[in-house]
């Protein structure tokens, strides 16, 4: 590609020198540059194409990431710096797309980056949500959900020109397709993220400051929000309408493109493979069958055989409530044709396997979406070694007995392009100097390990952490209005708010630490504990956990005895942009889910890659991190997954007994201390207190004492900075395993078989 001359581009576009342009106009200039460069990249064009269908794609801002992938980042940054401009400040004008919520969507985004980087032919397919999940605001120490108006003047969406009709039970809607380019790192080619929108969508249904809207106006509301509130019947119906709209469009697109590439549809599996990312896209199975039979004249049995050989399913959860189940009557209302096919598929499954545990439709006429994926897909994978073993041995064991050949593990991964190149350029530069630049394309960081005792390298590594903390402090001051001490230990838990992730346990530790400091035990370094994440609006206890955290933050900040030594911060509207600032700065990575409940996690990998030490239960991919770095370079605690499973199976866990332990009772009852309750919302705090002491379904009280002991050991170890930085280096050196390039290579070698 031709060299970049930003001076010349500035004159051509604005008739001014680069030095004279303000940051907004430079942002426009860079967007145009990236679009023009990306437009010259041809699409990957293998015979067989992947369709990665997902309800979420948490892609983050794209300007810097795309410049890295297109190979122009360093050149652009150098020219801007020479002209007196800061690329990070320019990036602030970019609006982050609101197309996802948490790990599921961020994983999908990392995967798209790696698929393109490996030169594989594959697109992501999802929906273009106008208001995302919601924008999080904190009012009176409580979460308030408001619409996330991200679309506005959007520079990244390109009209595809395609449009499809989607037939529901008693009406039809029309879609329109927009694309986002996904260039591959070091590749001359690209793929795309294909986002379907509702042609008749009406943003006017959404009042300016509320996420409440008319859920009955299906022909106008389908693409307004990700995961609309499903706490009532109409909300649940809307979810089904939305999912069917997504997969019907995806299936029509897939068939059209396969025909364009030469398929006669009898050989469709040679031209297309579908990866179902969690159960939201499950209805693509009956929809493909419907299209092949009713639209293209293929016999039903052959259509089933075709689809069975081209659909693969990734399971992302062990939580039974997260495996989607819909009433058959609701599916019949949304699409009678799809419901009829599901009934036929259930009959086939029951004829083949007379076991009610594996039925698609159970005795209550409830449709189990994951069961359909397993029976009528050719591959089922978990996302971490422990997670896959639990699926095989427990959660999906009846299916594993039937289809052992379908099951495999594909441990999650993250793209180093975003999580080092973009998020932590100082660390990227250090790695280049110490081990060369091959890691940028191979993901292999293992050469770093031989420098574990090199004092100069360790000092330089410590300097990158200091720089990352300075960037994070500036971000927190400007965006969150929070001042963080320059010498603070940065302790971070960022993930969606859920009881199984146990933010409530970290809150109990904060209470313990507060009381310990009040008793005169002052830490040598101040400790700043940072939370980030959203709670589903209908998830009351999760909302209560947020309220407890925010109330603790206020309580501690107002106590002059404690505030100099302990700080609690919850990031408002935590997103990818915030993650890129906070993760590189972290010293401690909190991965404290109840063992056996987290499928994998990917924030654990991002923190590890950026040199934070992991404080964790042996859950999800934490197990693999521990195996890689060794016991001396990670901090583990808590009941094992087998112990937890035994407690659930026997029904012997008793939160009340643990609550009566004096040390634990002191912490839990602090929540209902009259003075503390007066600071917060008494109803919320009382409800959370009662839930923890009486139910504690995810066993925070089981692990709290060992957690406190282990965390105090972490803080003590931090004081020996030479040993701490050695542990940091060893963690980074072993993080290459978690490159999404490795994960995608495994998917392709073992599942997709793309050319």
Regions found by a protein language model. Give the residues of each.
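A conserved ligand/cofactor-binding region detector
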Residues: 1-755
């Amino acid at each position: 590609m031709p060299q970049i001359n930003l001076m010349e581009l500035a004159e051509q576009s604005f008739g001014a020198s680069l030095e004279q342009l303000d940051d907004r106009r430079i942002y426009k200039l860079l967007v145009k540059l990236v679009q023009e460069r990306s437009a010259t990249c041809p699409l990957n064009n293998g015979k067989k194409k992947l369709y990665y269908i997902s309800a979420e794609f948490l892609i983050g801002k794209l300007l810097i990431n795309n410049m890295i992938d297109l190979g122009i980042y360093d050149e652009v940054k150098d020219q801007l710096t020479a002209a007196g401009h800061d690329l990070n400040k320019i990036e602030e004008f970019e609006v982050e797309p609101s197309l996802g919520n948490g790990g599921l969507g961020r994983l999908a985004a990392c995967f798209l980056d790696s698929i393109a980087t490996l030169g594989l032919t594959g697109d992501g397919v999802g929906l273009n949500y106008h208001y995302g999940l919601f924008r999080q605001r904190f009012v009176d120490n409580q979460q308030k959900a408001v619409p996330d108006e991200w679309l506005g003047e959007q520079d990244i969406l390109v009209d595809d020109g395609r449009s499809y009709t989607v037939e529901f039970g008693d009406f039809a809607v029309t879609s329109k397709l927009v694309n986002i380019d996904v260039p591959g790192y070091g590749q001359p080619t690209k793929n795309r993220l294909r986002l379907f929108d509702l042609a008749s969508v009406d943003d006017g249904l959404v009042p300016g400051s509320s996420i409440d809207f008319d859920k009955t106006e299906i022909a106008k509301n389908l693409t307004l929000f990700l995961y609309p509130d499903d706490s009532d019947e109409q909300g649940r119906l809307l979810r089904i309408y939305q999912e069917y709209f997504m997969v019907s469009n995806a299936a029509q697109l897939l068939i059209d493109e396969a025909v364009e590439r030469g398929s006669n549809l009898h050989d469709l599996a040679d031209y297309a493979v579908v990866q179902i990312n969690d159960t939201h896209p499950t209805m693509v199975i009956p929809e493909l069958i419907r299209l092949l039979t009713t639209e293209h004249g293929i016999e039903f049995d052959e259509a089933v055989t075709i689809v069975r050989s081209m659909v693969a399913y990734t399971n992302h959860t062990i939580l039974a409530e997260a495996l989607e189940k819909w009433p058959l009557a609701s599916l019949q209302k949304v699409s009678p044709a799809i419901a009829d096919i599901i009934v036929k598929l259930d009959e086939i499954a029951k004829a083949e396997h007379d076991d009610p545990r594996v039925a698609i439709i159970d005795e209550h006429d409830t449709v189990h979406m994951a069961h359909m994926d397993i029976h009528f897909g050719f591959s089922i994978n978990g996302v971490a070694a422990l997670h896959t073993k639990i699926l095989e041995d427990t959660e999906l064991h009846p299916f594993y007995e039937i289809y052992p050949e379908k099951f495999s593990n594909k441990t999650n991964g993250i793209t180093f392009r975003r999580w080092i190149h973009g998020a932590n350029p100082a660390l990227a530069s250090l790695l280049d100097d110490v081990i060369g630049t091959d890691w940028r394309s191979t993901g292999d960081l293992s050469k770093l390990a031989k420098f574990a005792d090199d004092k100069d390298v360790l000092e330089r590594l410590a300097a990158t952490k200091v720089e990352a903390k300075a960037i994070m402090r500036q971000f927190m001051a400007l965006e969150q209005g929070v001042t963080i001490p320059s010498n603070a230990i940065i302790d971070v838990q960022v993930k969606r708010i859920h009881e199984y992730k146990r933010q409530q346990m970290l809150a109990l530790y904060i209470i313990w630490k507060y009381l310990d400091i009040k008793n005169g035990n002052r830490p040598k370094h101040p400790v700043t504990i940072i939370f980030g994440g959203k709670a589903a609006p209908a998830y009351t206890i999760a909302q209560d956990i947020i309220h407890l955290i925010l109330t603790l933050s206020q309580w501690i900040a107002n106590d002059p005895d404690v505030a100099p030594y302990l700080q609690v911060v919850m990031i408002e509207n935590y997103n990818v942009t915030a993650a890129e600032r906070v993760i590189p700065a972290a010293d401690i990575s909190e991965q404290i889910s109840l063992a056996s409940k987290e499928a994998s996690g990917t924030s654990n990998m991002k923190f590890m890659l950026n040199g934070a030490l992991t404080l964790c239960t042996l859950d999800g991919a934490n197990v693999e991190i521990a195996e890689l770095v060794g016991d001396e370079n990670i901090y583990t605690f808590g009941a094992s997954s087998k112990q937890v499973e035994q407690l659930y199976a026997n029904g012997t866990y008793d939160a009340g007994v643990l609550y009566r332990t004096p040390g634990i009772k002191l912490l839990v009852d602090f929540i209902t201390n009259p003075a503390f309750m007066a600071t917060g919302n008494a109803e919320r705090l009382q409800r959370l207190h009662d839930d923890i002491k009486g139910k504690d379904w995810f066993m925070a009280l089981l692990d709290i004492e060992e957690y406190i002991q282990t965390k105090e050991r972490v803080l003590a170890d931090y004081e020996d900075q030479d040993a701490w930085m050695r542990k940091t280096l060893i963690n980074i050196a072993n993080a290459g395993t978690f490159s999404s390039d490795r994960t995608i290579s495994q998917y392709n070698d073992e599942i997709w078989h793309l050319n």
